[in-house]
């Protein structure tokens, strides 16, 4: 008697579980915030399926073409239901898995938005890598099982092939075939689940990437705005500094032909007895010098004014330190002998010079500076004076000249003249006329005219910078001679190393280039700041007098003078007129950029040799 079907075919339950790793953004959404965490998902067919042992369906009167497909259909349905359930829970599983991964990294509340996104991108990237690996494993599984389309195969097709396999290779082959079919179906559904998980993760990755790009773009825009603002600030600051430097180095004068002294960046220096008295004092000095030279030609100087600093009367905004006050004096160049026929424009274009029989000089002594007219001989006092042409600046309404500095660290000098009216080619009716500001008065210094008294100049004169300024023909302004403060009267620090000396140091002072500054003296003076050239010179000779070796080379008379800051005497054959002491010579002229206090630029020479050097003698 045939057994019931239930006794012949039975099913053990097939366990299907969820597994997988997925990531998403904040709270399952797409914004920036606490990001989601991974969940393991996928179908697992590793448990035994419990297929009915195969003997011979014919022996029990069962048609395998009918009942095997029923068994397969039931198995496939169970797997499909598990897949559908896992698919419904996919997004929640993805979110939970991402939340778990994020929590493992600790709180993100103190992180910047960009750091939160970068952290999220790392988590999602890791999840994508894991899912792609599992997707690949399931795809390989399908390939190993014959690369069939397990999702579309019919139960009848599977049953027929399973029975055929069993009839040929026995019951175990039959059950292995059905196991492989279910493994393949499970792998196929896993491929779908992992593909969907990867798609979900990729959406999150794209969202986070876009958010990162937005934050970075905003940061870049902010950085550009800040850079532009900083560049603008620096440009404005530089413009202010340049304007301040320009103002501090501008000598402003009226263009009325009067004799005026002006302090750079401050204004006109007041004259104790009025401007007319200063002009008269210069005229008297020139006349006295002319009479003296007519009877006994030589290098003579005639003082005409003294400049004193009176900080007690200076305004608070004005610099009250005499050492830092730079000044210039301007006067009619014709009074110093400028030939009326000279073409100043042509000379200036050629960067040339014009010889003058007289020039101005100044010498600081303590808090007072003496201004003098000095005769020129081409040797002790050069005749050549550089020429510059002034140009009208329609923006400022001033005539201006810019004089490049002779040293790299110093800014250029700017001279301005305020005309009584615009030049002839400027039509005041066509535009709003520029009204220049009146030149202010500097109350921190006073010029006092003195009686003209001639004296033989006691040395080779290192003249301050001076210029002859020409003006356009339509300006109505006569050529002006301008003398600047002697650069040797400007404070400075000693530099240079000097040279080692031995034997009779000043023996070289009467020949060749002269005697170098001894290195041991340079070591003592280097780095010290001196009020002016006179201050340096005095400290130099005091240092020499106190040197145990060098002091042995001088007689008691010279040593006494040197200890008071004076220079030692020279023998009669090396004297020149009233010049009887050792002199210090700048190898490169100060006017040519030679350092005033650069001890490598200084040599000690006798008066006779000094004159020969200036004559070009070897």
Curated annotation (Swiss-Prot):
An individual GO BP term: killing of cells of another organism
Q: Report the EC number(s), separated by commas if there are several.
A: 3.1.-.-
Query: What domain of life is recorded for the organism?
Result: Bacteria
Q: Top EC class per UniProt?
A: hydrolase
> Which keywords accompany this UniProt record?
Antibiotic, Antimicrobial, Bacteriocin, Endonuclease, Hydrolase, Nuclease
Under the heading SMART domains, the entry gives: HNHc
InterPro entries assigned to the protein according to its UniProt record, in alphabetical order:
Colicin/pyocin_DNase_dom_sf (IPR037146), His-Me_finger_sf (IPR044925), HNH_nuc (IPR003615), Pyocin_killer (IPR003060), Pyosin/cloacin_T_dom (IPR016128), Pyosin/cloacin_T_dom_sf (IPR036302)
Positions of disulphide bridges: none
Gene Ontology MF terms in the entry: endonuclease activity; signaling receptor binding
Query: What family does this belong to?
Result: Belongs to the colicin/pyosin nuclease family.
Q: How does it assemble?
A: Purified pyocin S1 makes up a complex of the two (large and small) proteins. The large protein, but not the pyocin complex, shows in vitro DNase activity.
Described by its record, this protein's role is as follows: Causes breakdown of chromosomal DNA as well as complete inhibition of lipid synthesis in sensitive cells.
Give any extra note attached to this record.
Answer: Pyocins contain N-terminal receptor-binding domain, translocation domain and C-terminal DNase domain.
Q: What protein is this chain from?
A: Pyocin-S1
> What is the source species?
Pseudomonas aeruginosa
Q: Which gene encodes it?
A: pys1
